[in-house]
Amino acid sequence: MKKPLQPTPEAVLEFAVATIETYFRIEALTRSIGGFAQAGGEWGVMKTLIYQGPHTVPDIARSRPVSRQHCQTIVNHLYEKGFVEFIENPRHKRSVLVQVSKKGRKHFDEMTALFLRAARDYAHHFNADDIETATTTLRHAREVLVI
């Protein structure tokens, strides 16, 4: 069996540019659907907390390509809305854990339903295999591109 051809640097750059362009369109869409500027970031932080359990702000930031300060801004905004709460961290006295509140879980589920409705509106433009391949490729790129 032949080894797949390695892409050219130009092709990898084009992939990166297309990813960035798509990201900004998706971000604009999530803002319009979520009704607030940080819709995607807030949803992403809550998703991390729901699926992985309580985290410190630095831990959340390390799992995403954002600064701790940016992540703290998102968490503070979620806290002001009552979507997350701070709990004692048995491993560290000064770095509290963040967890999603009941109100936050309800909000997350509502946002997810809105995002899924939008995804349904666009799904007919794609082939299922292409979406699966693109998702696999992007996840692989995320693992390879370590800063």
Residue map of PLM features:
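Charged, amphipathic alpha-helical coiled-coil/dimerization segments
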Residues: 77-136
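N-terminal positioning helix adjacent to the helix-turn-helix/winged-helix DNA-binding module
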Residues: 11, 22, 41-42, 103, ...
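Short, hydrophobic-biased segments on the C-terminal half of alpha helices
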Residues: 57, 75-76
